[in-house]
Amino acid sequence: YKRQLLRDVLCQETPIIFKRNSTMYASIAFLGGCLFVLLSNFTEFNQLYIGTGNGSPWNQQIRSPGGGDNLFLSSIVALDADTGKMNWYYQTTPEERWDYTATQDIMLADLKIDGTDRKVLMQAPKNGFFYVIDRKTGELLRANNYVRTNWATHVDLETGRPVLNPDKNYYEKAVWMLPGTFGGHGWQAMSYDPKQKIVFIPIMEIAAVHKVKETFAKTGLFKMQPGTVNTGTEFNLFQTVPDMSDGESIPPITGELIAFDPLTGETKWSIKHEQFWNGGPLTTAGNLVFQGNGSGFFEAYNAETGELLWSRNTWIGIMAPPVTYMIDGQQYISILAGDGGASNFLGDNFGEWEGKVASIKYGNYGKLLTFKLGGKSKIEELPERDLTIPQQPILNASLENINAGMDIYANYCAICHGSGVHGKTISDLRYMSESTHENFKNIVFDGMLEENGMKGFSDILTEENIFEVHSYIVDVATR
């Protein structure tokens, strides 16, 4: 745009070690706040609206030991479209420490609020609260939760700040949080019906366990590790959930499409899907809501009641929103079918959707699908994949090797190949061929397949580490 937002990182020659309560921190400690998705521009006020990301590392004790709000992380910001000067901002998550981005799509609407016509922007960021803000002044008008939240009890409309739940302070103990790291609403678009004044949101309920990094808790030191996710928390707790000291059970993972009233916080209706990772919706003037889902179905609902009116199996997982357009008086609806994104991290390892994920059941294919009333073309039915896990090699590994491999896998491999060795659109390593097993060290350590995108870890891990992670994968595959 006319003005770029830049963040200088001047730490290339700096040892990446940070000490608690130290006044000197390498600048890498203050990363975060990046933009992920589309910007919203509105000419009436000549403003550009952006949503910013979370802090990194997640643990604010490491990133900002003195505390504070950490402006402008997880914020909605209005910029002058000509100069780039900030006109106003609203921070959704002060003291951000949960990976709660505010980068989700920003929607513009006209609403009557408390008897006054207001020009507003609306957002459902990851933290679970739905924000209605005067887009000219930045005044917070509503902040109702659209999913269950336990990290904060509510948002105080007077101060604009969330009221934190003291029982969910992960600085003191391991706790499970709602929303988790995936958020209540992710990258997938939401849509709006201007007649009903209702927003349709593809929500997720995925709790995450947060705990301060063990080494930091004991020593006050945090060392950045290349090649992994440096959250400052025990990231491997995502796949090995400990017993919670408060005795609470973690709720099941679910995904829904909800019809949400942005002013009252009421959910008018909801559709529960077979899994959590589904597509963004499209609302039409014909009182329809279209949505694709992770089970491979593209469906249309009555916008007022949520009644399912039409469904078509595409045999492809869908996460994109559809679009509609007219050509020569004929209305079309098109959608890019294909799966991916952060859902790779969970695969089908959690929840009750095993065998229902289209990209696992049939494979992952990117296709542009277009529909119209009276269309005659058929979608090719895909055969189910053979998901029989092959015979595994004998590695003569000890329990110590396997446990060490579990930690290595969680920190270096799970982000692509799936937590607990349950992959999705990137290779599920339980299905490695005999040849791949034989070349495991050559691939993972030496980088034999680097041209295909699988970089070697010889600069980070040892050959013993590679044996340990291989042992863990084989152990999981033989259970």
Where are these regions (language model features)?
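The canonical Cys-X-X-Cys-His
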Residues: 405-419, 440, 444, 454, ...
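Conserved small/polar residues in nucleotide/adenosyl-binding loops
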Residues: 1-4
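Repeat-blade elements of multi-bladed beta-propeller folds
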Residues: 25-27, 31-61, 75, 100-125, ...
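Gly/Gly-Pro-rich "capping" loops immediately C-terminal to redox-active cysteine motifs
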Residues: 418-453, 457
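Electrostatic cytochrome c docking/interface patches
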Residues: 383-408
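C-terminal capping alpha-helices of c-type cytochrome domains
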Residues: 458-479
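Conserved blade-ending motifs and adjacent loop-strand segments that build the rim/top face
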Residues: 95-97, 104-105, 147-151, 180, ...
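Short, conserved, GDST-rich strand-edge loop motifs in beta-rich repeat architectures
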Residues: 51-70, 205-250, 338-360
